[in-house]
Amino acid sequence: MSDGTAAMGKKGRKRVHIRCRRCGRHSFHRRKGYCAACGFGRSKRLRSYNWVRKKKNRT
């Protein structure tokens, strides 16, 4: 009788993300096997999107 609702709260104690080998940030997901910051393990190219950078104010 220990696999019920009370045991579900004890699942979040392990480290989900570890340090990435490519970018060095603490964003490499251990179970998924790729970095959330740079995309290492998922693609050869560096993960970058335009919505991450702040847009220039051209008025």
From Swiss-Prot:
GO MF term set: rRNA binding; structural constituent of ribosome; zinc ion binding
Zn-finger (C4-type) residues: 20-38
Record Pfam families: Ribosomal_L37e (PF01907)
Residues reported in the UniProt entry to bind Zn(2+): 20, 23, 35, 38
Gene3D superfamilies registered for this protein in UniProt: 2.20.25.30
Cofactor note: Binds 1 zinc ion per subunit.
Single Gene Ontology BP annotation: translation
Segments traversing the membrane: none
Cofactor: Zn(2+)
Keywords: Metal-binding, Ribonucleoprotein, Ribosomal protein, RNA-binding, rRNA-binding, Zinc, Zinc-finger
InterPro entries xrefs: Ribosomal_eL37, Ribosomal_eL37/eL43, Ribosomal_eL37_CS, Ribosomal_zn-bd
One CC-aspect GO term: ribonucleoprotein complex
KW Electron transport (keyword) present: no
Superkingdom of this protein's organism: Archaea
NCBIfam families assigned to the protein according to its UniProt record, in alphabetical order: PRK04179.1
Family listed: Belongs to the eukaryotic ribosomal protein eL37 family.
Role: Binds to the 23S rRNA.
Listed name of the protein: Large ribosomal subunit protein eL37
Organism: Archaeoglobus fulgidus (strain ATCC 49558 / DSM 4304 / JCM 9628 / NBRC 100126 / VC-16)
